[in-house]
Amino acid sequence: MTTLYIDADACPVKSEAERVATRLRLPMVLVCNGGLRPPANPLVSLVIVPEGPDAADQWIAAHCGPGDVVVTTDLPLADRCLKAGAQVVQPDGEVLTPANIGPRLATRDLMQDIRAADPFHQGRGGGFGKAERARFLQSLDRVMAAAQRIG
């Protein structure tokens, strides 16, 4: 059965993901370091991992597999999930695949190097609004349908 895993720390689309999981009657797992209330929805569970770097990422990567969907902005986690057979959607609606994760990781690493070399070079994050939420919902619907065929 398809499970929707959410890298929940600072995820801006938890409620949208819950709506999709509820509509499809599929389990959703919020994974975080704490600070979230236990969900009232019986389809949604909360996993609180110990404090520490990448603890939530490690938990998600260890539990996801073919037919599952992961929502994350963390590219190394996305790479691990894709290698485990899961599908990955970013909160902005971009679907990550084995074909596009390599260039995304390379760009991420390059930008980290640039920021380390020039502390005044900071990225300018765009806003997150209705258009991004709508794009996320469309992508998640499409990916969940494909995942259900696998799982």
Curated annotation (Swiss-Prot):
For this UniProt entry, which residues form the secretion signal? none
List the PANTHER family hit by this protein, alphabetically.
UPF0178 PROTEIN YAII (PTHR35146:SF1)
- Which named protein is this? UPF0178 protein Pden_1915
The species this protein belongs to is Paracoccus denitrificans (strain Pd 1222)
Sorted alphabetically, which InterPro entries does this protein's record hold? UPF0178 (IPR003791)
Q: Which NCBIfam families match?
A: PRK00124.1
Upper lineage is: Bacteria, Pseudomonadati, Pseudomonadota, Alphaproteobacteria, Rhodobacterales
**What family is this protein classified in?**
Belongs to the UPF0178 family.
